[in-house]
Every structure is written in structure tokens, then in C-alpha cells.
Design a protein with these regions (language model features):
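Terminal, low-structured helical/coil segments at or just beyond the last alpha-helical repeat
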Residues: 2-3, 80-116
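Alpha-helical segment of the N-proximal tetratricopeptide repeat
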Residues: 2-28, 32
Length: 116
């Protein structure tokens, strides 16, 4: 099975509320490709759905290291920290996400207004 097939199966299982099974599929996809960001994010979200916030935070931190410019990764990590009561950490990740979004907006303004 390909990493994409495993990821897709995981999404289907998560949609059905079978988060433990989804986690197993995401982990198998990550065994095939440890840098598969979509599977890592889905893994974090599935752990969060089970209220396993330590595992969700661990996966989200790995995702942020893998994709440091991913706004959603930092936003998710911030949310997990907040749910765990780790307010300073949540605020720091939220600030990173806002800064990345501002940079994205500025970049779009620079490239969008010139007409190519």
C-alpha cells in the first residue's frame, strides 16, 4: 500500500470516528515517508480527538519542524497547547502563525499588484 492510500484510509476512518485505527494508518504512512506532512498533521489531529494532547503536541511539533512556514501547523500546535493549559506556549505558536500570515499577505500584495 502506498503512503497516499494509507493516508486516505486514515481520513476515512477518522471521519467514521475510528481514531485509533486512523492513527495506525497515519503511522504506517509515516513509516514509508517520515516527511509526509499531511499524515503528520492528520496524526496530530487524531490524537487531539482522543484527548491525547501530549501525543498531539509531539506530532504537531514535528510538523512545525518539518514545515516551519506552515501557518496551519503552528495554529494547530497553539490550539493543542491551549487545550492543555500551556498558555505561554500557545501564545508563542499563535504569534508565529500570525507573523507567517502577515508575511504571506505582504508577499501576495507585492506579487499580485504588478501584473505579470
Amino acid at each position: 500500500m502506498s503512503k497516499e492510500d494509507l493516508y486516505d484510509e486514515g481520513l476515512d476512518l477518522a471521519f467514521e470516528g475510528k481514531f485509533e485505527d486512523a492513527i495506525e494508518r497515519y503511522r504506517r504512512a509515516l513509516e514509508l515517508d517520515p516527511g509526509y506532512a499531511d499524515a503528520l498533521h492528520a496524526l496530530a489531529m487524531a490524537h487531539a480527538e482522543l484527548d491525547d494532547l501530549d501525543a498531539a503536541i509531539d506530532a504537531a511539533k514535528r510538523l512545525c519542524e518539518l514545515t516551519p512556514d506552515d501557518i496551519l501547523a503552528h495554529t494547530s500546535l497553539s490550539t493543542f497547547y491551549m487545550r492543555k493549559g500551556m498558555v505561554p506556549e500557545a501564545e508563542a505558536e499563535s504569534a508565529k502563525a500570525r507573523m507567517l500570515d502577515w508575511k504571506r499577505q505582504l508577499s501576495e500584495q507585492k506579487t499580485g499588484g504588478g501584473g505579470a
